[in-house]
């Protein structure tokens, strides 16, 4: 027969309330009493019921992650970092994918979700996005990835600075017509994309180089989209000699398009990606490397800290970027 809290209390000579507090690690329990209760529970092979513990603590025992996508590389890696941290906690993960917020058919998180979780993690979505803004009405902590809001923890990178690093690298190589493969037409509800677009344009302006709509094409953050976008840029009357792709996957597609047109990446047209995808090394792609899994892990830990101590002042964490130069970029060839 399974042991109960009453059995522990009778054996340890304390009340059931004291046993409950001692086993849950709550304050106002004498250390000697806490240790005696722990030893009795261990001797009687007592197992704490997670459901009962959550009920007693007033917690739901889970957190919700709100993300636009699940299957795409970046979001999958962020989720991997989140899961690694949660494995060391007693919280479950509820995943809600709302789809592309720029499209009218996306599905917002159900309002009932607010009553089933102890906190929210929001990935890459503007806090004004429909279905996201409502979570701030819930009286639970919220941590943000790739965006910020007053009163919330946030973890991310400087996307504008990353784009500037990429474009400045191309400018330093002598390229005067630098193209862009973005995810979608601006403006966009994705803050990282908006920031990278601004960094791209700012760098060109500072270098005295042309900023033209004809130098930009949308790749929808897919390999196929990147290939189509590069093909579009190559067909322009005055095509670029270098291209910055907002993601490595779009850059992979751009490289495929170059080869299909008999062009050699680097020698004939330079390409820089953004992410640090594992395949970038095999494809010899110059890229801006971001610590994707660490972003997810740091955000998850921040949320756990906020759940444990709601009085903690939220922090905005910006993680560093790096650029790895490979064969897809080279000095501009004279005409």
PLM region spans:
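Short beta-strand segments enriched in small/hydrophobic residues
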Residues: 16-20, 55-71, 169, 177-186
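Residues at secondary-structure transition points
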Residues: 3, 24, 28-32, 50, ...
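N-terminal helix-turn-helix DNA-binding module of bacterial transcription factors
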Residues: 1-61, 333-335
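Bacterial carbohydrate/catabolite-sensing allosteric modules
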Residues: 43, 84-89, 137-144, 148-335
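Alpha-helical recognition/docking segments in bacterial nutrient-uptake
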Residues: 3, 62-168, 172, 335
């Amino acid at each position: 027969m399974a042991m109960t809290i009453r059995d522990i209390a009778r054996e340890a000579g304390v009340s059931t309330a004291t046993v409950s507090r001692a086993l849950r690690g709550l304050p106002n329990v004498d250390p000697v009493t806490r240790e005696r209760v722990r030893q009795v529970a261990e001797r009687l092979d007592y197992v704490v019921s997670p459901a009962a513990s959550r009920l007693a603590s007033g917690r739901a025992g889970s957190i919700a992650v709100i993300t636009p996508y699940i299957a795409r590389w970046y979001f999958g890696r962020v989720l991997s970092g989140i899961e690694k941290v949660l494995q060391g906690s007693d919280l479950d993960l509820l995943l809600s994918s709302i789809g592309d917020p720029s499209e009218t058919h996306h599905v917002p998180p159900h309002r009932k979700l607010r009553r089933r979780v102890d906190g929210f993690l929001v990935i890459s979505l503007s806090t004004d996005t429909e279905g996201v803004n409502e979570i701030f009405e819930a009286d639970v902590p919220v941590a943000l990835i790739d965006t910020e809001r007053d009163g919330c923890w946030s973890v991310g990178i400087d996307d504008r600075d990353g784009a500037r690093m990429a474009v400045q690298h191309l400018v330093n190589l002598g390229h005067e017509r630098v193209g862009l493969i973005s995810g979608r037409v601006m403006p966009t509800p994705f803050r990282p994309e908006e920031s990278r677009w601004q960094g791209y344009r700012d760098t060109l302006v500072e270098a005295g180089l042309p900023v033209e709509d004809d130098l930009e094409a949308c790749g929808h953050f897919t390999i196929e989209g990147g290939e189509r976008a590069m093909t579009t840029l190559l067909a322009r009357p005055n095509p670029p000699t270098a291209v910055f792709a907002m993601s490595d996957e779009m850059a992979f597609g751009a490289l495929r398009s170059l080869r299909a047109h008999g062009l050699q990446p680097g020698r004939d047209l330079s390409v820089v990606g953004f992410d640090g995808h594992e395949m970038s090394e095999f494809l010899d792609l110059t890229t801006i490397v971001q610590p994707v899994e660490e972003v997810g892990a740091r955000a998850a830990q921040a949320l756990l800290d906020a759940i444990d101590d709601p009085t903690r002042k939220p922090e905005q964490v910006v993680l560093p970027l790096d650029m790895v130069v490979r064969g897809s970029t080279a000095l501009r060839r004279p005409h």
